[in-house]
Every structure is written in structure tokens, then in C-alpha cells.
Amino acid sequence: MPVITLPDGSKREFAQPVSTLDVAADIGPGLAKACIAGRVNGELKDACDIIDTDSELSIITAKDEEGVEILRHSCAHLLGHAFKQLWPEAKMAIGPVIDNGFYYDIDLDHKLTQEDIDALQKRMTQLAKTNYAVDKRVVSWQEARDTFEARGESYKIEILDENISKDATPALYHHEEYVDMCRGPHVPNMKFCQNFKLMSVAGAYWRGNSDNKMLQRIYGTAWADKKALKVHLNRLEEAAKRDHRKIGKQLDLYHMQEEAPGMVFWHNDGWSLFLELEKFIRQKLGQYTYQEVKGPLMMDRVLWERSGHWDKYADGMFTTNSESREYAIKPMNCPGHVQIFNQGLKSYRDLPLRMAEFGCCHRNEPSGSLHGLMRVRGFTQDDAHVFCTEEQVQQEVSACIQMVYDTYETFGFKNIVVKLSTRPEKRIGDDDMWDRAEEALKQALKSNDIEFEILPGEGAFYGPKIEFTLHDCLDRAWQCGTVQLDYALPGRLGATYVAEDNSRQTPVMIHRAILGSLERFLGILIEEYAGKFPTWLAPQQVVVMNITDKQSDYAEEVVNLFKEHGIRATKDLRNEKIGFKIREHTLRRVPYLLVVGDQEMENKEVAVRTREGVDLGKMQIQEFATKLKNQISLRSLNLLED
């Protein structure tokens, strides 16, 4: 007679074993109708799974995040069901849940078209509307293998042979005539899988190995109701408009090409953005008393072996040979900074020593993962390392945290999620070192009243880290900043200082990045602002346009005056109608569009309008220049107002 304890502490006693669905029905018909699955003693279970001992139970519905994940997973099975009806010869591989949706990898000789995807969406909808029940059957390993062998599902057989113990009892989910294998849980009925949309098709190697066959991966999204689906699709539509690759081309910021995969060719305006961002960070470095250094692009393999990177990260490094020596192009700056620290005797009085670099790094990312500025092979880190004593750690980490928040606020990012990543399975150093490192970061966060989540096992191999994830205007998460303690690397590379008692001690090293990669952060900013950069950051801050040739010299004079004030100004003296010029530069997202005609020339004025179409009227040149300089110096996010 199991006693079921519900989340509110109430208990229900049953005369025989029950399922989550039975308990939901006992509470009320509405809950039974909404029940997707259950969390039994902390473990997710199918609604039909039997509970035969006293247990704690939470009933999962589509209102729960877990419920939405489950229905997304079941939509992948629905996809498989529909796909096998349309293409019986297909072989199904895997169909997991991903952020906001699901995908299924499928082996089919026929290359899928948009018409095929539309037909698949239609068939999935037809099947889901029948509200058929999903039948879960737990079977022996051999029975599962026999089932898929009879159906010619070679990928399922491979999974069984290579990944599942012969002593296991796999769960087979029957969707009418279609059968899939999964840990579950899944929805009990397809009535929960009504709000989905297939999004795209891409290639994917089986098991992510390029030596294996290329499969076709179908992506989909699924939500609990029509409203949530619509909101998501609208957000995707807005994200597509803001795609930094598209805007980068429109605004002539940069390009990438096949001969240099993952490497950025910065054009004039894009490089202006890059330099302005670098200038801003450099000013922050001055405020927080950092030295700026520059290390070599590549160093001998021996150094990377001593640092531990060769053993842990060799596959991600580009290498080259010269005069019988093997060199690695640096994927990160830290070993080089330790070399600079090691030049000359250091005393405890020299600590903390804060060392920063705009380091040009390279990582051998898989070609399939490259994505515009967001995932590249060559990038610039706004990297810094603080060498300090153990007693200085909390104060220095707190200063790093404050610098991160100061920086993000300038760009308008206020929703920041903080996570503490702890020791991974593969790591250097002993447990005592990791205990001290993790505790120091926790205390620094707590002393700053910052809420944080712990990510077990997600730290770097040389130390735990704090990760700062900012959320943009579309509520997308971008992990950018890190503050990471390292008790191991300085010792491995021989860094020491003379302590107050004249003993030689190893400094603690704090790794710190705010933007992470300048390239990636610029990609984020392009999408956050949709190319409408704040005036201080904009490549072109002002464009001066004449109405007729009579004002050409005056327009030149205005532009030169702005340049003397350090304002990035350009001119448009083409023999085009002024309306045409205004439209063109509005599309170029130039913050201020200045028109000069006979009257403006006579009165030494400019007619000012913003890229948003707001008419600010006529102003004296010096007056506007002063207002603009003030706005730029404050790094305001807003344009001048009427």
C-alpha cells in the first residue's frame, strides 16, 4: 500500500501499486487530463510507470519546464512516425531534445527539399490530431534488437550493440505502427504534441564523426500552446532580421571566405567598431590599474607541455615546425603572461600585479561549428591575469566582478546570470587546491551579494571559474565574461615571489575576460542594436549632405570641423536628390544626418535629423558639435532628443 507524498506535503494512501496518472486522477479529472509525467523521488518517470513503494511525487504538466521538454522529445518520435509513413526506406538514427525544440537524424538517400518538409509537417499534424495513445513497453535487450532488426533499423541496432548493456531492459515507445527506443519519459498521448513547427534541414555526421555517413538532420520547435509557439516564431523572425552576418554585409563591416575559414576580414567600418571597442576596454584597464602587455603569437611545444595545455588541449591548437622545433599558435594568453611575470625578481610588495592583453588567439574549431563572428578560429581575447597572494584573492575577484558589471552596463546589458563552474573530471592540481579555489570564488560572489548557480564539473582543467551570461533584447543567453582562479599554472611554469618572511612562494593567478572574444562580442552587439550602434561606437557618427553643388564647400567645412572635434564625420556630395541621400544613409544606420542648403550655409547652421527620422531642427555647427561630443564622451545609448 504505497503512500504518496505530494509537493504540498499532503499524503495519499493507495491499496495497490499506482501510476502517476492514477494519482493525478485521484486528485481530480483536470489534473489527470493535464498529466504528462511524474517526478518520483526526484527521478522523471512516465505517467504509466508503476509506483509500488512509499514515494514523493510531483506531477508534471505542460505548465512545467520539464513537461515542455518531454513533449518536445515526443515530437521527435512523432516526426519519426510521420517520416516512416512517407519514406518507409529511411533509417532512423537519434532524435534528442535541444533548446526550444528537437531534431532527428535520418539516413535517406533522397535529399530532402522544402516541399518534403512541408509534407512532413502536414503528416505530423494529421497524426497528432488523432490524439493516439503512446504505448510504452519495457523489453529485454534481445527483444529490442530483434524488433529493430525486423524493421531494418541499423542505427538503433548499433546503439544497442555499442551503448546498451545486454542486461538492460530498454523501453520501446509504440506510436501506432512506429516503434522508437528511448530512456523517456514521453507524453502518454499525442494530444500534448499539437503546437510544433519544422524549421530546417542540415547535414550531420553519424555520431559527429566525419569518417561516418552524412545524415539529414531535421530541426523542429515545439511548445505547450499556440501562443508560446507564435511568440517563439516571432522572436526567430526578429532574430533573422538582426542576424549579424546579414547586417555585417549590408553595412560593409566584414567578410569571411573559404580560403580562411573562421578568420575575419575586417572592412573599414567594421575595423572602426573593433578599435572603438578595444579603446573602451583599454580605458577600463586604466581605471582598474592594469598593465597592458603583448605576447608572441606562437611558442615552442615544450612550454605548452609544461603548462599542461598540450596534454589537455593539443587537438584544439594549430602547430607548425621550423628548424626541427615544433611550435603551437597560442589558443590562449595565460602561459605567455606567466613568462612576462617571471622576468625579474618579484616581491610581495609587487602584488597584486594585473596584466592585460588584447591577445590574438587561434583555436582549431571544427569547420561545421563555425558561425560568422560568433564561432571563429582566429579571435582577439580581452584577456587579463592577476597575480596575487592568497589573502588578496577575494578582493581581486571582487574587483574583476565589478569591472564586468561596469562594462556590460555601458552596452545596456542588465540581465546577467552568474554561474560558478567547479572541478571537471580531467584536471590538474590536487583536491585541496580545488577546495580552496572554489571556496574563494564562492565567498567573492557572496560578499558582492550576487546570486549564482553552481555548474558541477564545468570548470576549466586548471581551475574553477565564474561565468557571466548576459541576456539580449530577444532574451537569448550569451556567455561572455569569466573570472577564474588558478592555483596550478603559476607553479607549473615556475612563477614565484619573495614573501614577507623572505621565502619563495607561488602566486595565485586569476584569469579574467570580460567580452571573451572581441569578434564574438561585436557579433552580439550587431544583433542587439540591429546595426543601430550607439553614437560613441558607430563607425560613422555623422553624415553631411548638400542639397545642391552650391553648398559643397560648406559641407566640406562642416565635416572638417567635426573631425577636428574627434567626431567621425563623412560627406555625401553626390548629385542626387536629398531624399535619396537621406534614405540611403538611414539604411546605413548613421546616427545623425545633417542637411545643408543655402539658408544653413548663410547662417552657419546644419539641419539635424536622426536615423530614426526625428527632426531636431537647425543648430549652429559648434552647438551641435558640443552636444554630440558630450553624448559621445558619456557613451550614451540614446540619440539626442528634440
From Swiss-Prot:
The keyword Protein biosynthesis applies. GO terms for cellular component: cytosol. It is found in: Cytoplasm. GO terms for biological process: threonyl-tRNA aminoacylation. It catalyses: tRNA(Thr) + L-threonine + ATP = L-threonyl-tRNA(Thr) + AMP + diphosphate + H(+). SUPFAM superfamilies: Class II aaRS ABD-related, Class II aaRS and biotin synthetases, TGS-like, ThrRS/AlaRS common domain. It comes from the Bacteria. GO terms for molecular function: ATP binding; metal ion binding; threonine-tRNA ligase activity; tRNA binding. InterPro entries: aa-tRNA-synt_IIb, aa-tRNA-synth_II, aa-tRNA-synth_II/BPL/LPL, Anticodon-bd, Anticodon-bd_dom_sf, Beta-grasp_dom_sf, TGS, TGS-like. Zn(2+) binds at residues 334, 385, 511. Binds 1 zinc ion per subunit. Its cofactor is Zn(2+). Catalyzes the attachment of threonine to tRNA(Thr) in a two-step reaction: L-threonine is first activated by ATP to form Thr-AMP and then transferred to the acceptor end of tRNA(Thr). Also edits incorrectly charged L-seryl-tRNA(Thr). Homodimer. This is Threonine--tRNA ligase. It comes from Shewanella piezotolerans (strain WP3 / JCM 13877).
